[in-house]
Amino acid sequence: AQQLTFPDAQGWGRFATGARQGGAVYHVTNLNDSGSGSLRDAISQPNRFIVFDVAGVINIKDRLVFKNNLYIAGQTAPGEGITVYGNGVSFSGADNIIVRHMRFRMGHKGSSGKDAAGIANGQNMIFDHCSFSWGLDETFSINPDNKGKHPDYITISNCIMGQGLMPHSAGGLMQSDYISLYRNLYIDNATRNNKIKGINQYVNNIVYNWKNGCYIMGGDSKGDSFVNIEGNLFINGPANGGNAFSGGAGEGAFNFYGEDNWQDSNMDGKFEPKEVTNYAAGVRQSIRYDYPEMPKWAGNTLLENLLPIVGASLPYRDYCDCYMVDEVNSLGKQGELLANEENLPYGTPDKWRVWGGNKKIDSDGDGMPDAWEKANGTNPNKDDALVIAANGYANIENYINSISVADHDYFLRMPMCVEFVSSTSSCIKLKWRDYTYAEDGFCVEITKKDEILWKEVARTAANSTSCTIEGLEPGVAYMGRVRAFADAGKYSEYSPELTMATRP
């Protein structure tokens, strides 16, 4: 049997080989926009496994353009992982690409009229557990330009495509063939979640908060479509976008097999989906097309099965993904169509305080940590990353495939977006966003505004997002701050200090 890209790779892109056929390991050693050790330099040449010795935000001015035969392994980063911000990325012309656990966040200062991520030509690619946001045209599109190879045999799986920027705000235009869209979250895109043409499978996706277009049946071009649409969940949000399915403007028959698709249109904070019966357009088939088999969850179970793991979840989700997942969990009550990412409450990535973590010891510099090599029978003192193991993967692929949530550096993230809510003469209520992992709770400290002695006044349980401080003096100005704690005596950094006051 043909070797899968990684053991649970699915869909038409599942045989991409990246740099397995011969290449080199490239270490990203800094967060610079360009130059030696940068991500831009790493992707400028073909035939590379790209690993990360650093964590943080890479601020880019120009778009990143990827070469052939690359494997970008974001889960190898220490700390809180890698976020790319400032412009979009292009995989056009790049064959045989593997991208995992990366975040690409374009932003309103990016190249005008461009996607956050796009493919116009090139084949055999898989994007798994990645996050894409803030595109100025689409968030992630595969749209042929009739140059080079037709963009076919591509999988986008376990990814988040979110917050396409207004006025366009579109999830994706999918007008190619042999495209698998599997277990993704499309959120806060006004339209095109996706707009689909050609040979396509759309399985186990969640779409949340669209306005004038959710799943659009048929693209903008000529040609017939043959599509499986199975086990998806559509949840209306504040943009109140109506039915999940609508017809497209393109010419040609839209032939589809639709089964087990659900929509919750109540926008009331309760999960009450109904199975879709109105597909609006197209020619419905009674037998599914014989496309690549893939495991399926029931469409009405995706909140519990997909939402906890979707996006670039290793080593930790970033603030943007945490924010979007919280919106989905509100079940219709939260969500917005965004014009400028600078308006988000947690700030833009270039201002984030990202924990860098600790690079694992790798004596021979082959991209595989010594501890893993010793445990798995490879040589920590010899560059053996590209040696093909008995299971058909290169040694470095076996290392990458082994990385799980249990391998990340232990880290308590501080509570985000701490806000004053209300007060009485003796109480003050605060709220915050809980983007922290594995905390046992949060502790709240205050001091009078003209004093410097901080005092802990409350402790909350894990996963809490608010606290009422009691027993305060009337008519007094206070400063407040919050941090996460774990019972092992570990603490996060403090949140920024907040000014507040009791009523007289």
Each language-model region and where it sits:
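Acidic Gly/Asp/Thr-rich repetitive segments characteristic of extracellular carbohydrate-active
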Residues: 4-50
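Extracellular beta-strand-rich solenoid/capping regions of secreted or surface-exposed proteins
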Residues: 40-46, 57-73, 82-100, 106-123
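Right-handed parallel beta-helix
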Residues: 69-74, 78, 95-106, 123-137, ...
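Extracellular beta-rich repeat passengers
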Residues: 196-344
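Extracellular calcium-associated, cysteine-rich motifs in secreted modular proteins
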Residues: 344-411
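Pro/Thr/Ser/Gly-rich low-complexity, intrinsically disordered linker/stalk tracts
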Residues: 409-438, 474, 491-504
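Extracellular low-complexity, O-glycosylation-prone stalks/linkers
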Residues: 434-459
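Beta-strand-rich modules
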Residues: 469-488
